[in-house]
Amino acid sequence: MKLIRFFTILLLSTGLGLAAASGVRAQIVEGRDYTVLPEPRPTESGKNIEVLEFFWYGCPHCYDLHPHIKAWQKKMSKDVSFRYVPAVFRANWVPGTKTFYALEALGVRDKLHDKVYDAIHLDKIDLSKEDLLFDWMAKQGIERQKFVDAYNSFSVQNQASRSTQMSKDYNLAGVPALVVDGRYLTSGKMGGTPQDTIRTLEELIVKVRRERAKK
């Protein structure tokens, strides 16, 4: 009996070790892997499950997560809608937010979104300085004055103000942060590695599906 018990314990220990080594995690836990927002926020995705990524171009952790988010988007389920939201915690984050919305207004966000990240983190260009930003945009083939006009437009100013308010309303403590269905928040800090963050995101989506199925 002692021998059987020994081998049982050994097998369990080995199994746990293999699970840890393979990156398999236990079920997500509130407070450790995600939090519930104090008040649910309205979504803009209709019947789809809304996923928001709050980010800042200058954030190295956002930059690290970005390729994983892009890969996840390619296999995203049809019942899920994804949207980037540039966060604003401080005044020096506003230029990045306005840059994002100006690119959207000009219809070139998809073309230049990654390049903005690379310019900041690989080329070490401080795009929070407007003269450098405008010159850089011109080098990307965007007419300088056209970008300046979009950047300073009333519409972009309004969107930047809305991002500032959303950063407060969603109870953000930092970025990157992912909000699912206006209720569940996970972040790079909570998620661990970028891969862990994506796994938590996927499990939160499954959680929302199950909750909706019960209604």
Name these PLM-found stretches.
Residues 3-5, 139-215:
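C-terminal cap of thioredoxin/glutaredoxin-like
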Residues 27-37, 125, 130, 196, ...:
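Periplasmic c-type cytochrome electron-transfer domains
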Residues 75-106, 110-138:
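Structural microenvironment flanking redox-active thiols in thiol-disulfide oxidoreductases
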